[in-house]
Amino acid sequence: FYGGPVWAAHSDAANATMIDSDDVLLLKPAWPAAGFDLAGKQRPSLADDEKPIQNKPLTGIVVIEIHHLQPGTEADFATRFETETACLMTADARLLAAFVTEHAENSFPRLPVRADENVFISVMGFASTEAHARHQAALAASPAWQDFWQAAQLGLTKQTETLRLLPTSQSLVGR
């Protein structure tokens, strides 16, 4: 991709939209089928789609949590996360993907990867900010989740980062 004609034609414009293109992690799905499942999804055509700024704001949000873990604990964290979150998913809250650090050589050195990181990343979709708040309340009320989270805190090397994103009108994620 980065050596092809599309990137050559649009790299300056794409790079101008990025806050930090040096903050890169090499990731793999946390368990089989944990990557994004976009099968059967299609983008609406621009001609048919109303822009979110015009009369139709997007209500859904995508929440990404980056858990910084002690080396060698990613698999256990992923297994417990998958088990404890499964019972808390609803139609308004769904796990879109989960990733862990891929401990492999960076095969694209032009893009520097932070090789010393050990992370578990969850990507969750919510129907609305209210649905996200309800999900957070359900987590707080779940003894199983609280047990998992208290134990997980011991394996974190720094505070969990939380990113909240609004899917664009053309996004396949969060639809």
Give each language-model segment a name.
Residues 33-34, 41-107, 115-125, 129, ...:
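Surface-exposed interaction/gating patches
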